Every structure is written in C-alpha cells, then in structure tokens.
Amino acid sequence: MKESTVKVLDDKDLEFAETLRSLGVQRNVAILITYLANVDEASSRDIEMGSNLRQPEVSIAMRALRDNDWVSEKEVRRGGKGRPMKVYSLLTPIDEIIKHFEEEKQQESAQTMESIQKLKELISG
C-alpha cells in the first residue's frame, strides 16, 4: 500500500475562505481558491481530501475558476490503464483574484449609490 501526504486547510485558511464567502463567493469556490492558493499544484483527489469537498463539488467549483481563467489544468497519465489524473494549479496570483472581488464590490457599491441618488432626485423633483 502506498502512503502519501496531502495538505489540509487549517483555521487561518478556513477564515480566509469564510471571508471570501462574506464577499458573496460560493462556499465550494471559496474553499477551492483557498486550497489552491496554498499548494503549487494538486490532483482532484488531493483537493477532495485536503479541502473536505466531494468530487462533484470540486468539479462544479472548478468550473467557476476555469470560467474566470484562474486555474490551469493538465492531465497526468498514471501507469497502466484508466483515465488520466487531472492536476490543477492557480494560473492567476491570489492577490489578483482578491483584486477582482474588490473591483466587483466597488462597482456594485457605485451602482447602489447611483440608485440612491436617483431616488433622492425623484422624491425632490
């Protein structure tokens, strides 16, 4: 039997993921971003074990990262038959991902303030 070690999320990582969630990021996406920010690369199986997410949750969350071009994906052939293993790594530095959410929230805030200003104008007009 082979033995391997997998990095797991600690309390600080979970706090980071929760902070992402407070910005409106889906739970599994936040956990996936946090996990990948802490490793050079990881297989789907490593991510499942280290983040405590199930395979379908990893796949769905990975789609969101792929849609934003934040993750690279490569297939690694294992010896023998069967499907190749997928290995993922963050393509975009974590500070740029944070900047994306910062800009998104600033834009939302500006739109909200615009609506409030319009309400003020309508009520006084």
Predicted segment positions?
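Short, hydrophobic-biased segments on the C-terminal half of alpha helices
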Residues: 62-63
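Short, cationic-aromatic polyanion-contact patches
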Residues: 18-28, 43, 76-98
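Amphipathic alpha-helical dimerization/coiled-coil segments
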Residues: 92-125
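N-terminal helix-turn-helix DNA-binding core of bacterial DNA-binding proteins
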Residues: 19-53
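Glycine-centered, phosphate/nucleic-acid-interacting loop/turn motifs that mediate DNA/RNA or nucleotide
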Residues: 69
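N-terminal leader segment of winged-helix/HTH proteins
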Residues: 1-23, 78-79
